Amino acid sequence: MARQKWLTRLAASSGLLFVVLADYRMIRGSDPASPDLTSSGQSVVQYAAGHPVGPVWVELLAMVLLLVFAIVLYGRLRSAEPAPGAVAIAVLAGGLLAVSLKIASFPAVMVLYSRGGETDPATAYALMAMNDYSFMFSLVGQSLMLGAVGVAGILYGGIPRWLAASGGVVGVALFVNASANLSTGATFFVAELLFLLWVVVASITLMIRTGARSSSLVRAEVAIAAR
């Protein structure tokens, strides 16, 4: 029982660990001089020449942790939802979509920064744009994931309803943010910050509720045995 409780808490902590690694990547990658979709191909080449690719494994590990957290959410919600559990499955599908879209951009980033100033400007811009648009589309996956969390949690439980409702709101914000960016080419990601904050709160909440649920189960077993 103690080992199972420890493993459950460890799985729930994947969301918190994901945010830690994601923030590490964002802090290292936050550079006012970095090119965006409005930059010229030549400026992308010049920037790539002076900035070798960072620790891609950190971002890859962060994506794996996000997928694990999506599986944890699926498990909690699926246990409360009646068969066939379609809404809970949508949570898992959204997480898988978000992770897959982001990981798909890794080869483009590695080619761009490993070749440095040798890349043709048009090719360099295309590689950079692939990375940016991939991230924008990954927000759609995150939106599906949290939108499904909101629906399943409010209707069937499995997680606190306040957590489910706030997740649903953030899911809508993610979709609006992604749609606006994809339509205009802008690169503001306010909703992504809300997503990271929600994941932190959800991860800590699920870790705490694991202990509370186990204690309730023990008390119930003691009460049954005393009869």
Which residues does each PLM region occupy?
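Hydrophobic, aromatic-enriched alpha-helical segments typical of multi-pass transmembrane helices
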Residues: M1-R227
